[in-house]
């Protein structure tokens, strides 16, 4: 015979003594639940750490389970980055966005995702016309839509791939003016111990997908086309023991899409065409010349990385080589070569990365911009001359801290970075940039706070001596990656608020 619960409960309530015991039991149960929640958070942090260690070990062994862009991008950083935000790749530098809790919308082997990002920018901006170069922030407009991203990822047996398209707000035009472009479009196949990608994919050059950088603005390697460079071609990756190798052939750059510029509505920095020219005194005339400049063709890339150590202590030493033909318009054809040596050290959650790069362009000295030591390069719908030969040292230090005690934050990664563009031309002023910042992540939210201090970066301030600003009517009137005639240290604070889905 089953006793009715009410029959048992009523006498007990009449006596009154079990009530304090019940309250005590409820309180003890609540304490146990809270303790279990904390233990679960700690376990999740340990699992993420073990996952990262497993990735490094698989990559070092050349295993096919570590695909060439693992984990897959949901956006990037990194970005980037210019105004970017790309992601982790096969390289050993962590990306600018690691979102462990984001579950994309999935149909069969296809994942649908994207991102929406907003910028707050403040810094050394004096003019009321943000159209003077790609300041992306000024005294007139501090807050703006940064990026809208749609992405499609494929993972079906040995086949994998990615499609990503981006829209950017144009701060130099009235809302809703914008430019947009294809970021990536490639299909890959995994073999037993190697893999192949075909399409618009990331060129395997340097220590990581964004040089050695973790920051929103990247390091200066990006602005000369040697980091996070998306081009059209084939990329093959394989491993042997502690070695990992990449080889690539790229027919062309990723191309120009929708914007106001002649050839620069694109994500990655490339040699481009423009409709501008300069006289022998360096005075620039915008839109007055036939299309002139260069386009990349038949690029060859090699990279080798050796891994030392395992688990929480490891080092990755490598070298990269690159050669590109340049198809001239209005000028004779040219070429470019580049090399880099790079090292990344990991100690628990600390990471120290360094890279030394060298590049040289061989171009026609008789050109419409009348400057043999400059070449037009463009991205983000803006082109401007860059030095044709330079050394590029870059270094970064970062630490990932798992915030298990803070329920609204998964992790924070503070970082310090420095890079320089040491130009061969004696009359040019070198470009330098130092950045301090942090990445903040929770669920689908990813926030970057950056304070960049730079001399010679068109994305960091526009102030000149006195009350002046960058003067784009002259080749030597701008704080840039070319002549850097402004020669002034400026700062830029960026708060980038992104939601990834």
Feature map (PLM): residue ranges:
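Outer-membrane beta-barrel transmembrane domain signature of Gram-negative proteins
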Residues: 119-141, 356, 486-490
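Outer membrane beta-barrel
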Residues: 99-124, 138-256, 261-262, 306-309, ...
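Outer-membrane beta-barrel pore domains
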Residues: 87, 309-501
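N-terminal periplasmic/intermembrane-space "pro-region" immediately following the signal or transit peptide
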Residues: 16-127, 501
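Sec-dependent signal peptide recognition
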Residues: 1-8
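Signature for the C-terminal beta-barrel architecture of outer-membrane proteins
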Residues: 82, 96-101, 129-131, 170-172, ...
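Short glycine/proline- and charge-enriched loop/turn segments
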Residues: 130-134, 213-220, 373-376
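Hydrophobic h-region of N-terminal signal peptides that target proteins for export
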Residues: 8-16
